[in-house]
Amino acid sequence: MRFLHFLIVAVLLASFMESGAMPRNPKKKRGWDTPAPCRYCQWNGPQCCVYYCSSCNYEEAREEGHYVSSHLLERQGR
């Protein structure tokens, strides 16, 4: 029974964090608070790139050698 309780709590916590209510790293600014620099793409991978780099210029990101997710490229029509 305890395992079931733990599992439910873990799933709820994971979905809460995934919804963006809690940033994965509280020290970093959330994408909807301030436009974050393109380096978030490189640090956090494709999921965070969509959130943090939505206002990011793809050409600038590519020139700086940052990773840009395919989802972001689709949004910018590339």
From Swiss-Prot:
Keywords: Amidation, Cleavage on pair of basic residues, Disulfide bond, Ion channel impairing toxin, Knottin, Neurotoxin, Secreted, Signal, Toxin. GO terms for cellular component: extracellular region. Disulfide bonds join 38-49, 41-53, 48-56. Its main location: secreted. It comes from the Eukaryota. GO terms for molecular function: ion channel regulator activity; toxin activity. It is found in: Secreted. The modification Glutamine amide is found at residue 76. Transmembrane segments: none annotated. Expressed by the venom duct. The keyword Signal applies. Residues 22-26 form a propeptide. Residues 1-21 form the signal peptide. The presence of a 'disulfide through disulfide knot' structurally defines this protein as a knottin. The cysteine framework is VI/VII (C-C-CC-C-C). Probable neurotoxin with unknown target. Possibly targets ion channels. This is Conotoxin Cal6.3a. It comes from Californiconus californicus (California cone).
